[in-house]
Every structure is written in C-alpha cells, then in structure tokens.
C-alpha cells in the first residue's frame, strides 16, 4: 500500500462529536481511539502513525481535513 488515511480532523466550528461520527460511519472509517479534542478540531485517529510514511494534511471539504500517509518515492521501488 503506497498511501493511507491516518486521521480525520473536523472543525469544531462546524461539527460536534455526533455529526463527526456520522460522517465517519458514512465513509466507512472506524476510529481506533477516542476523539482527541483540541482547541479548534476534533481529531479521530484511523490508523497508528508509522515512521516509514511521510504525512500530509489535505483539505477534503469545508471543515474536514485528512492526514494522509504516503511512502517516500525511494521506498516505492
């Protein structure tokens, strides 16, 4: 696998825990831990981080970001 979703972040201005969990269920994502409640985001970890991957945060839609793990190009050979 060359990439995976490590976490999903929901803006607290637009989502509460109930609506965030509904979005996760609708997209077949299962958090492995309880929500990490920060100042601005609700963070749901989907997979444990792995040091072999480089991580990038991508905006999915208004109020939702995904942390994506990608193998470095050197490891894809």
Label every model-predicted segment:
Residues 1-77:
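Mitochondrial intermembrane space
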């Amino acid at each position: 696998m060359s990439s995976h979703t490590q976490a999903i972040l929901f803006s607290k201005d637009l989502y509460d825990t109930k609506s965030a969990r509904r979005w996760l269920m609708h997209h077949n994502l299962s958090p492995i831990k309880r929500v990490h409640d920060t100042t601005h985001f609700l963070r749901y970890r989907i997979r444990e981080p792995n040091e072999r991957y480089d991580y990038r945060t991508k905006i999915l839609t208004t109020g939702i970001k995904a942390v994506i793990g990608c193998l470095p190009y050197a490891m894809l050979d």
